[in-house]
């Protein structure tokens, strides 16, 4: 089983980012970041402030309760009006009802998973929206490539991450087509650069940047959908063959070794990697191990849990003046 003690070390990283967002206007961005941190099993080591925790879960319960009473149209319209990062302003106002349903469901699933993972009670009427029929409909929509067709050039990475994960759920015996996934992420990243001038990200053309950003959301979405589907189905066999989280993490490690380390100077990338480490990868792997009694046998990859290789990579990264220290901490420890 995976050792979660590294979450204690991660507390200083989380504190650093909380300090970074301390003076942001409004509370939504703070809440967004706290929500992301809450997705990991180690949240007790990170969100030790009882007021922050209380605020987080009160906010989540309130949002979930409100959205369970809304139609898919209402949820979509609210989402379009809440554009604090500026990346939805170009999304078409008129879209297929299936698209509205898809994004509404992913929103509900994310909120529900936050509560489930904290042992919180969820509203009794949750089954009106998150049920087997709707989950299967989401999978069908994603597998039809409707999202990429109807929102081409205007969707955002959360949607693509959900699309990739749902394709894995539907076709979990098919090897991952990394070239296709990379192509999707490259297109989305170009959209960010062209349309989102207000977002303070470096305009890196490095493919690894696109790759890791997209994979971050894939890991989070995979973990969310896994939790939601298992909760609804109460079945340990539904995702027996889905072990792609291992491939995601291993590919990230492999890719970074031959990349331009200068991109790790980007604080946003450091946050993406922190998100993988805290919110998605470790948790999804742990759940797969626990529910399926599977050993993912990371030792066979000689990448992440091989002490000798890990230390060598650590020294290599530390020797490079452009490497972001937060990256080293969250990806190696």
Language model feature labels by segment:
Residues 1-333:
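Preference for long, amphipathic alpha-helical scaffolds in soluble/luminal domains
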